Amino acid sequence: MPQLNPAPWFAILVFSWLVFLTVIPPKVLGHIFTNEPTSQSTEKTKPEPWNWPWH
């Protein structure tokens, strides 16, 4: 049963992951994000009551 011999497919698996891990991260990390995240205030805002016309 050839699928039990790990020599051919294990080497292909390892080399393909090495290629993915050396090529993809620099491409992804090379992007420049145009929107800088802003910190939101931690104080809780008080909700404004609505003036509903109850008919």
From Swiss-Prot:
Transmembrane segments: 4-24
Superkingdom of this protein's organism: Eukaryota
Organism of provenance: Salvelinus alpinus
Region Disordered, residue ranges: 36-55
InterPro entries: ATP8_metazoa (IPR001421), ATPase_protein_8 (IPR050635)
A single Gene Ontology CC term: mitochondrial membrane
Protein name (record): ATP synthase F(0) complex subunit 8
Gene Ontology MF terms: proton transmembrane transporter activity
Membrane-related topology note: Single-pass membrane protein
Predominant localisation class: mitochondrion
Organism ancestry: Eukaryota, Metazoa, Chordata, Craniata, Vertebrata
Localization: Mitochondrion membrane
